[in-house]
Amino acid sequence: IALSLVGSEMCIRDRAPTGLAGMQRADGEILAAQAAEEFGVPFTLSTMSICSIEDVAAHTEKPFWFQLYVMKDRDFISALIQRAKAAGCSALMLTLDLQILGQRHKDLKNRMTAPPKLTPANLVNMATKPRWCAGMLATKRRNFGNIIGHAKGVDDLSSLSAWSAEQLDPALSWDDVAWVKAQWGGKLVLKGLSLI
């Protein structure tokens, strides 16, 4: 099935942002974007990705979309939008349905962090995955590439979660959407908009 969505030809009809793939495999978002290019599948990079907008753009040939959350810090949002423009992103996907973070019980139970903390349980787990460890040691991308440099101290999921809970703006309105649209000036897709 082929279709066109905001001027992008694609062979599938659904599209979702990719983030944290860099925790599963070194440079995971870059690899996902390259695979998407190879197979003609659209790619959208998440704000909360391990690889930055610039990292993905430097390792791909086709434009990709960038997914954005509305946060209270408008200077940060404006800077992200400018970075997406500079990287040649062809559309901005504005997420509307994540203004209040849910509890990810498995992540809390497993004490998931990025990069992994060196606990005895994690050391045993990593010892059984030498290929993953070698890949992670070889890459420079181990943190949230789109957040680092703005939010000091955001180096694992629990600090990112606290920062996000403080930054995600539950008072999201159509005025905010208009502000993002004016900042972006390009193709804008609203994600998470439903009729009730």
List the model feature ranges, each with a label.
Residues 1, 67, 167-170:
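Short, flexible active-site loop motifs that bind/organize anionic cofactors or intermediates
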Residues 1-12:
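Single conserved hydrophobic/aromatic residue that forms the stacking wall/gate
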Residues 3, 24, 188:
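Short glycine- and Lys/Arg-enriched binding-loop motifs that mark or flank ligand-binding interfaces
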Residues 13-16, 43-45, 64-68, 92, ...:
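Hydrophobic faces of well-ordered beta-strands that scaffold small-molecule active sites
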Residues 13-48:
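Glycine-rich active-site/cofactor-binding loop and its immediate structural neighborhood
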Residues 15, 37-40, 64-66, 159-163:
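N-terminal start-of-chain detector that recognizes signal peptides
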Residues 38-59, 63-77:
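A gly/proline- and charged-residue-enriched helix-loop-helix capping module
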